[in-house]
């Protein structure tokens, strides 16, 4: 019976054959990921680094950027949503069916760390995001006054997170540092 199905699929559509084998052998799971954070935290740079492994000059995101990226055995459908105040009010429109949140923090922006904390906890407490993993990137570690991971955990009260998987990684999206480790963790927790 298996041979018959296999031959029928191959003759009918090669794409269907590959989809069948991806399904049969556990490859190709798609995860819907939101990349959120305050404006100028490095969300778009991080997404571009994942997409092409190259840094590039970005401009403030008006609305959102979407990329589909293969990462190991997963396919990430990633939405990088603008972090300006007017766009943060719209984030909730993207929460349905979300599999994980990537929250990017500008580690050098001490003045807005309390705003980042409020936004992070608003997400952590949102009922539509209950039980999904959160990956925090302490970004811009290349800057001389960037706070380290331990300081950001303290400033954002992340040790109070309960009943969900979470991790924080120091990163520099412009250089690509720390991103792979974070997404390896995320892949294992989806």
Sequence positions of predicted segments:
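TRAFAC-class small GTPase G-domain
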Residues: 2-3, 7-190
């Amino acid at each position: 019976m298996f041979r018959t199905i296999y031959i029928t699929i191959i003759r009918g559509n090669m794409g269907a054959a590959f989809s069948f084998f991806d399904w049969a052998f556990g490859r190709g799971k798609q995860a819907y990921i939101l990349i959120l954070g305050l404006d100028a935290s490095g969300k778009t740079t991080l997404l571009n680094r994942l997409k092409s492994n190259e840094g590039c000059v970005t401009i403030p995101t008006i609305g959102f950027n979407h990329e589909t990226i293969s990462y190991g055995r997963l396919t990430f459908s990633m939405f990088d949503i603008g972090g300006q105040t007017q766009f943060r009010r719209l984030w909730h429109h993207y929460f349905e069916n979300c599999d994980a949140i990537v929250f990017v923090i500008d580690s050098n922006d001490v003045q807005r760390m309390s705003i980042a904390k409020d936004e992070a906890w608003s997400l952590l407490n949102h009922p539509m995001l209950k039980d999904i993993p959160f990956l925090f990137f302490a970004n811009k570690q290349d800057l001389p006054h960037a706070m380290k991971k331990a300081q950001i955990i303290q400033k954002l009260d992340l040790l109070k997170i309960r009943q969900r998987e979470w991790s924080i990684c120091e990163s520099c999206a412009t250089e690509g540092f720390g991103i792979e480790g974070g997404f390896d963790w995320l892949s294992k927790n989806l």
